[in-house]
């Protein structure tokens, strides 16, 4: 999608769609405004808020547990959508969700 890389499937992220929130990893460079414009290209999707934070880089491990460098820092976005404006996860289902 350009900016948004993949959805996140952590314990917290699995509970977020109940509150019309979606969590995803994003490229580190785009701003919240740029990501908002890209997501709102979906038909009938309107965003209320975007929260973002950078995840720690962490150590890259080599063989035998030796530290060989640092992994790239990631950005995580939590997007809140307007009521009745869900992201269509399952096309053809009511409100984009399986009943």
Swiss-Prot record:
Subcellular location, record wording: Plastid, Chloroplast
MF GO annotations: rRNA binding; structural constituent of ribosome
UniProt region (Disordered), positions on chain: 1-37
Keywords attached to this entry: Chloroplast, Plastid, Ribonucleoprotein, Ribosomal protein, RNA-binding, rRNA-binding
Cited Gene3D superfamilies: 3.30.70.330
Basic and acidic residues bias spans: 12-21
Family: Belongs to the universal ribosomal protein uL23 family.
Biased composition annotated in UniProt, kind: Polar residues: 22-32
Gene (name only): rpl23-A
Self-association state and partner proteins as the record states: Part of the 50S ribosomal subunit.
This protein's GO CC annotations: chloroplast; ribonucleoprotein complex; ribosome
Described function: Binds to 23S rRNA.
GO biological process: translation
Main location: plastid
Record protein name field: Large ribosomal subunit protein uL23cz/uL23cy
Species per Swiss-Prot/TrEMBL record: Selaginella uncinata (Blue spike-moss)
């Amino acid at each position: 999608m350009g900016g948004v890389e993949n959805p996140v499937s952590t314990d917290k992220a699995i509970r977020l769609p109940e509150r019309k929130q979606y969590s995803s990893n994003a490229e580190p460079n785009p701003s919240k405004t740029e990501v908002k414009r890209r997501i709102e290209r979906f038909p009938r999707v309107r965003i209320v808020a975007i929260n973002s934070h950078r995840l720690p880089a962490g150590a890259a491990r080599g063989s035998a547990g030796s530290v060989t460098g640092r992994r790239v820092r990631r950005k995580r976005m939590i997007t809140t959508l307007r009521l009745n404006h869900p992201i269509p996860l399952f096309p053809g289902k009511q409100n984009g969700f399986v009943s």
